[in-house]
Design a protein with these regions (language model features):
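Signature of N-terminal electron-transfer/Fe-S-associated modules in redox systems
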Residues: 1-162
Length: 162
């Protein structure tokens, strides 16, 4: 089945079974390997991408659900260079093994898009299903706060209003 979608701002057409997980299309057909396979059951968050701006687990999202949609992977989060979250991750030395980080950052980006100034409780709720084997959760929270401040400082007046 031919499925058309937009990935990281680029229109693509893929040939895949409708029920193939979006993760495998992203990694195997589009060669975007920043999105990781962790559990295959939507439990760890390593495969998190954005589908029309919402964070989804690509390991359980059939590619047919992405037909005509906009998909953003970690590679497309900031076409101009490093995203504020990526810079904050480095500043706070979040990554140890790094395997979960793409999914963590994508989940955090979805949170900040909806909640520009999240509280610790909001961060914990939004991030509680993204697992980090190295347990860098306090640094993840600190990095999200830092990125929120950076994004707020660089927002235009119209963006700040709403």
């Amino acid at each position: 089945m031919s499925i058309s979608l937009t990935v990281n701002g680029k229109a693509v057409s893929v040939d895949a079974p409708a029920d193939m997980p979006l993760l495998w299309v992203i990694r195997e057909q589009l060669d975007l390997v920043g999105t990781k396979f962790g559990c295959g059951r939507s439990q760890c968050g390593a495969c998190t991408v954005h589908l029309n701006g919402a964070a989804v687990r690509s390991c359980v999202t059939p590619v047919s659900r992405a037909a005509g949609a906009n998909v953003t992977t970690i590679e497309g989060l900031s076409p101009e260079g490093s995203h504020a979250l990526q810079r904050a991750w480095i500043e706070h030395d979040v990554a140890q093994c790094g395997y979960c980080q793409g999914g963590q950052i994508m989940a955090a980006a979805a949170l900040l898009a909806k909640t520009p100034h999240p509280t610790d409780a909001q961060i914990d709720t939004a991030m509680n299903t993204n697992l980090c084997r190295c347990s860098t959760y306090p640094r993840i929270r600190a990095a999200i706060h830092t990125a929120a401040k950076t994004l707020s400082a660089s927002a235009t007046p119209a963006q700040k209003e709403g």
